[in-house]
């Protein structure tokens, strides 16, 4: 939600005019105000019923569930039935995931799903996110004074919060995940290229160019949180197979961290006047990388909106193109019946052949 980042930038901005040791001591010291309310909140928070069920503590799970549930006489809520469902679901999950290994993530159709999940997360950094993480320093190098640079940074983190809620709303009204992700990347690419071209503005108009750059950073932040920054988590949860979901998510997050480290090392060199000193021209680099992400998303990332997990499994098994996921019709029940009938026929075929041959021998 970026609330912590917004508060942090606001505190640092208020310290800009101080030139004593408290300019850095106060921001550090204010961090000591958070442990106490967090500790109190942790003590008051109820335990997860699912966690208790997985450890066989069903009675404690029922108490936690009742504490978390608003009891309404008009509803048919039954705590015992809910706990029974949790116990059954936990047993099924344990049965399904038994014997699964990380190597299974790279076998058969699961290899494609693992690749997509990993790339969806990596694209969060490759689309220019690490560039925006240095927005204050970048804007100062672009020509803004420190106060205005921090003001734009506050606007950026504030608009990030708006973008998260906006993404939730757009997905709620029915806009597809692939659609949001793909068109969001297109918007990010345009914003990055615009920032790159602003570096070509003559030095006489540097002040106007720096203000325009700050404005583009805010628009970039809005596009990012409306799409890639928020939708990626939905895609990761829906596109990974149930049996290997935890392992697939771990692999995806590991790649995200590796890419984040690489981008975090490169970006300061791009912006530092004593190093590569690219300034606004770094927008061309990240814009080019973002364009490659658009190409990948167009050809590889499917649309999971409105699909059950069983339907997604069938679509991946049939190797349906990512661009045709939304329009392909599948019937899970027909598929299951036809497949099981065919397998049953195949298994009985030798016996039928032997019986027919024996009948021929008898009649002859």
For the regions a language model picked out, list residue spans one by one.
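Alpha-helical transmembrane bundle of multi-pass membrane proteins
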Residues: 1-66, 91-364
């Amino acid at each position: 939600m970026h609330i912590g980042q917004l508060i942090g930038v606001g505190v640092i901005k208020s310290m800009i005019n101080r030139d004593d040791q408290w300019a850095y001591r106060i921001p550090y010291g204010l961090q000591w105000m958070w442990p106490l309310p967090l500790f109190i909140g942790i003590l008051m928070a109820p335990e997860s019923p699912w966690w208790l069920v997985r450890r066989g503590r069903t009675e404690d799970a029922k108490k936690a569930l009742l504490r978390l549930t608003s009891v309404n006489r008009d509803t048919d809520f039954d705590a015992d039935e809910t706990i029974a469902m949790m116990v059954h679901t936990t047993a099924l999950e344990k049965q399904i995931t038994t014997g699964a290994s990380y190597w299974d993530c790279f076998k058969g159709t699961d290899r494609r799903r693992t690749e997509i999940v990993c790339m969806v997360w990596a694209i969060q950094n490759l689309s220019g996110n690490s560039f925006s993480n240095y927005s204050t320093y970048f804007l100062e190098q672009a020509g803004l004074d420190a106060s205005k640079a921090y003001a734009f940074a506050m606007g950026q983190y504030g608009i990030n919060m708006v973008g998260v809620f906006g993404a939730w709303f757009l997905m709620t009204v029915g806009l597809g995940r692939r659609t949001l992700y793909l068109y969001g990347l297109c918007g990010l690419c345009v914003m990055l290229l615009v920032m790159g071209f602003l570096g070509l503005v003559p030095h006489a108009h540097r002040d106007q160019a720096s203000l325009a750059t700050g404005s583009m950073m805010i628009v970039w932040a809005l596009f990012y949180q409306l799409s890639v920054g928020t939708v990626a988590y939905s895609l990761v949860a829906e596109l990974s197979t149930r049996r290997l979901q935890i392992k697939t998510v771990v692999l995806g997050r590991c790649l995200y961290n590796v890419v984040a480290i690489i981008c975090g090392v490169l970006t300061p060199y791009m912006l530092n006047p004593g190093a590569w000193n690219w300034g606004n021209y770094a927008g061309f680099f990240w814009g080019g990388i973002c364009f490659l992400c658009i190409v990948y998303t167009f050809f590889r990332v499917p649309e999971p909106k409105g699909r059950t997990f069983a339907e997604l499994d069938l679509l991946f098994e049939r190797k349906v193109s990512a661009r045709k996921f939304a329009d392909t019709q599948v019937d899970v029940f027909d598929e299951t019946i036809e497949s099981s009938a065919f397998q049953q026929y195949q298994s009985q075929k030798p016996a039928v052949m032997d019986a027919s041959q024996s009948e021929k021998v008898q009649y002859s």
